[in-house]
Structures are given as C-alpha cells and as structure tokens.
Amino acid sequence: MKQPEKNVLEVKNLSVSFHSTAGEVQAVRDVSFSLKKGEVLAIVGESGCGKSVLCKSIMKLLPRSAQIKSGKILLNGTDITDYKEKEMQKIRGSAFSMIFQDPMTSLNPTIKIGQQIAEAILVHHPKKSREEVYNLSLIHI
C-alpha cells in the first residue's frame, strides 16, 4: 500500500493583524490550506483583501507593524511560525521563495531568469560552482 504524500506546506488557522494609531486591523483571518509536492495553489481576491499579507506571513517578511496573531505555518512538517530571521534566511530561497507582485523589483529584466535563479542557489550552496548551479537552474533543480 502506497504511503500518502506528506504536505510540503501547510497553513493552519492563520490570522494576521496590523497595529496602528487607530487600533488593530485584522488583515488575514483564520486561513488554512495545504500543498503536496507538485500541487499549485492560486490565491485570488480583490485588491487589499490580504493575499500579499498571507504570502509575506508565510515567508516571514511582514513589516514590524504586523503580527501573526494565531495559527501555524508548517514547512515539510516543521513548524516555522516562530522562526527568527536568522533561521528564515537559511530556508528562504532554498526550501521556498516568493516572486513579488511587482516584477520590476523582483526580477531584473536585463539578466536572464536562469542567472537570477542561479544567484539565489549560490547564496545557499556556496561550494557549488557558478556554472554547475546555472546548469541546474535550467533544468529546474
């Protein structure tokens, strides 16, 4: 009997709020989903509904005025909800990454995408040669 595939990413009851002089504003309320290897998830909604806040919460890239109020973020079964910045730097770009909504600030249009992916891999695997990493990026490894 085949083992059920484990979730690569699981978000459980995630709620995120922003603190301002006017008080607390809830931007993400009780969101849950899970993704297995090879699955794709589309997050759609009106402008300002919390899509970017949700994704930035998962990546732990929220501004200081924001706080994860409740819920869990599991990456390959490991709870990363309370990871500090140093721990996140080790997994961002290697275990998962994000291309932000504004492609002009995310991808450099004058550099081939393969080279940009290779740069991210080199940050996490400095012992690999630039050529080796570039070739791996071309075949999506």
Residue locations for each model-derived region?
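A short, flexible loop at the N-terminus of ABC-type nucleotide-binding domains that lies
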Residues: 2-8, 17-30, 37, 61-67, ...
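ABC ATPase nucleotide-binding domain
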Residues: 10, 32-34, 74
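The feature captures the beta-strand-to-loop junction immediately N-terminal to the Walker
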Residues: 44-46
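Conserved catalytic motifs of ABC-family nucleotide-binding domains
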Residues: 49, 66, 98, 103-115
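Conserved small/polar residues in nucleotide/adenosyl-binding loops
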Residues: 49, 139-141
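Short helical segment in ABC ATPase nucleotide-binding domains corresponding to the A-loop/adjacent helical element
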Residues: 59, 74, 104, 110-123, ...
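Conserved ABC transporter NBD signature motif
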Residues: 67-79
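ABC ATPase NBD coupling module
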Residues: 80-97, 123, 130
